[in-house]
Curated annotation (Swiss-Prot):
<keyword id="KW-0378">Hydrolase</keyword>
<feature type="active site" description="Nucleophile">
    <location>
        <position position="222"/>
    </location>
</feature>
<feature type="active site" description="Proton donor">
    <location>
        <position position="135"/>
    </location>
</feature>
<dbReference type="GO" id="GO:0030245">
    <property type="term" value="P:cellulose catabolic process"/>
</dbReference>
<dbReference type="InterPro" id="IPR018087">
    <property type="entry name" value="Glyco_hydro_5_CS"/>
</dbReference>
<dbReference type="GO" id="GO:0008810">
    <property type="term" value="F:cellulase activity"/>
</dbReference>
<comment type="similarity">
    <text>Belongs to the glycosyl hydrolase 5 (cellulase A) family.</text>
</comment>
<dbReference type="InterPro" id="IPR017853">
    <property type="entry name" value="Glycoside_hydrolase_SF"/>
</dbReference>
<dbReference type="Pfam" id="PF00150">
    <property type="entry name" value="Cellulase"/>
</dbReference>
<keyword id="KW-0624">Polysaccharide degradation</keyword>
<protein>
    <recommendedName>
        <fullName>Endoglucanase 4</fullName>
        <ecNumber>3.2.1.4</ecNumber>
    </recommendedName>
</protein>
<keyword id="KW-0326">Glycosidase</keyword>
<keyword id="KW-0119">Carbohydrate metabolism</keyword>
<dbReference type="InterPro" id="IPR001547">
    <property type="entry name" value="Glyco_hydro_5"/>
</dbReference>
<keyword id="KW-0136">Cellulose degradation</keyword>
Amino acid sequence: MLDKLKVINGKLTAGEKPVRLFGLSTHGIAWYPEYICEESFNALKKDWRTNCIRIAMYTDEFRGYCKDGNKQHLKELIEKGVVIAEKLDMYVIVDWHVLCDQDPMKYIDEAEEFFSDMSKRFANKTNVIYEICNEPNCSGTWDKITEYADRIIPIIRSNSPDALIVTGTSTWSQDIHCALEKPLKWDNVMYSLHFYAATHKGTLRSRLERCIEAGLPVFINEFNLCEASGKGDIDIDEANAWYEVIDRLGLSCISWCLSNSGDTCGVFTQNCTKLSGWTDEDIKTSGKIIKGWFEAFADEENTNEQCFRIDK
């Protein structure tokens, strides 16, 4: 059983020792359910040397949970992923993927039911992280997120009192400064920062550094090296600048995404249908760079207290 995750003095710890989590996020599981399998998760741990997987479940678009999705099937996929991750000693993020719905309060009733069910199912699993809203935006202001969190977090805590909870921030999880100015009242909570290197540059990095210096617990639970649309060219210079900050600050980071989509952000080429055994020819340029980041994190010396070492 993995150590419980806990935020201590603004830093993520496991067994009260500093820890860094890193890995890939799935695409929406209604789009790409095939990657929720032991074969893929094991390859990500052994070949990509990751220690965390994020399971993204859209709430609104494309068979979203709150629209036209099969709720029972989506929950079964999540549970399958959690069980596999536990078997492989990987942490797993259950992501309520707010995006087109903008304001997390739009589907508050469904969210309450979902997190009540999930936190009961996974009450005794120390590897589960609850991400309560992916990317609030536009009408999804920090005040709305706070209102939402104040309803969802007590539900999770009633069943999984020690679980780590991650909340999105406004403007597609870029406004971490709003959380710094007006943090949630709950313990063991981290705040999401998302970046796409070709779009989000020095201004957002400076904001991140200021918030970390002030003690805000930040989890980069979605990033890529391309544009925020998931398309376009990657920006190598900006990617390197982001890597330097992430590595220096010892931050946890999850990359979007585990798929063979035609977008730049999908790590595999479109003609790659493998679920493991991926070669360099199967992986897009951005995926190769991100894989290199994860390998570097895993290679950190034991003396680096920010590194979480996994079995090789």
